[in-house]
Amino acid sequence: MYFPVFTQIEGKRFLIMGGGKVAARKVHTLLQYGADIVVIAKKVCDEIKEVLPEKSIFEDFIKNAESDFLEKEIQKAVLVVAATSSREENHRVAELCHAYHILVNVADSEAESSFIFPSVVRKGNISIGINSGTGSPAVSKQIRCQIEKAVPDYYADIAIFMGELRQYVKANFEEEAMRRYILKTAAAKAFSKERVLTENEIKEIIRQGQND
């Protein structure tokens, strides 16, 4: 069973083993969150070459695999994805990662994976990760579609607004109870109105909190 964790990956080094369609999907996903990606593969597809700089791509997999190059690259990485077309190579990468306590996702073996890519719903800064727990991407996809319908776009605007309001409240109100009142009341009103609150509406919430 996997525990859902959101981690900061911006600027962190990811090693992708493989250069095909599966690897390209992983690269696309990770780039959205600012990861520093290196790809090692026998052949790298155009989708990857179009989005990564040449220095981040090593396209002579056979030569690299026969040297200690791969092992050194794994040790540099925070997370590794094994997405080659070879079961043997994916298994080898997984074993090296486990030996060095590096988290690895193995595209063709969830049993060898120490982390997985969830199905993700993203609305602005809001990210919702989904794992069905069944090993079935089709189930996760259906759940994702239902959540996408249930989460309107204005949620993203409210999330940004509440983040900014939280910083303002922390800087201007010392009493914890008052902070909680303002933020809880503002969030409830914003979602009920389905929009960001106006400055006057915030002032009214603060006034009510001070009078209670």
Q: What would you call each of these model-derived segments?
A:
Residues F58-Q75:
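Glycine-rich, highly charged phosphate/nucleotide-binding loops
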